[in-house]
Regions:
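N-terminal lobe of the biotin/lipoate ligase/transferase fold
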Residues: 1-138, 145, 190
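C-terminal accessory segment of soluble enzyme catalytic cores
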Residues: 128, 162-206
Length: 206
């Protein structure tokens, strides 16, 4: 089957998005639907993955949605690019590590096309870059695999309010900074989503 590309122009409620993803997983499992790459944005939302620790909440007044993806606590909201993938790993030798590498390399390659030197870190998962020799996280990754079908995906901070990260220890990483592409490299990123889609499709078909 081919990969469907879906782009939402208005913010999508997080739980509504997860419901859609889970339904697509079931449809793919029955060979009733195509795989999916979905570009969207969420309203301001804190989510906690399966590795979540209560000590990562600094502001106890915030509402948190516990979710099935891997990883710890993070924030989603306006100005952030979300990319969800529903991909059948049965067709890819059930290699989760390779699939994660495809996602990471697609993000890095896409950012490189904007002149951004980005890299992954095996110890601290996500995509990083440097400004004035300081490491800063600009993309977070978290997936879930059910019946060897992967869903959830990643987020890239483009022009969002990073003060929300002060309420948590993002991804449980205490000694690193979180930033946005606009804060580090002030340029137009309107074509970034298209670049990511192109690179993901190319690498997923290899």
């Amino acid at each position: 089957m081919s990969i469907e590309i879906k782009k939402s122009t208005k913010p999508v409620n997080y739980l509504d998005a997860v419901k859609f993803l889970e339904e697509r997983v079931g449809e793919i499992n029955k060979s009733e639907a195509n795989e999916l790459i979905w570009i969207l944005e969420h309203p301001s939302t804190f989510t906690a993955g399966t590795g979540f620790d209560e000590s990562d909440i600094l502001d106890k007044s915030i509402d948190i949605i516990k979710t099935s993806r891997g990883g710890k606590i993070t924030w989603h909201g306006p100005g952030q690019l979300i990319c969800y993938l529903v991909i059948n790993l049965n067709n890819k030798k059930r290699d989760i590590r390779k699939f994660v590498n495809i996602i990471e390399n697609s993000i890095i390659l896409s950012l490189n096309s904007f002149g951004i030197q980005a890299y992954s870190d095996r110890k601290n998962i996500g995509i990083w870059t440097k400004k004035n020799n300081e490491e800063m996280k600009i993309a977070a990754l978290g997936i879930k695999v059910k019946k060897w079908i992967s869903y959830h995906g990643f987020s890239i901070n483009i022009n969002n309010d990073i003060s929300n990260y002060n309420k948590i220890i993002p991804c449980g990483i205490k000694d690193k900074s979180v930033s946005t592409l606009k804060n580090i490299y002030n340029q137009n990123y309107d074509k970034l989503a298209d670049e990511i889609i192109k690179n993901l499709i190319t690498k997923l078909k290899n």
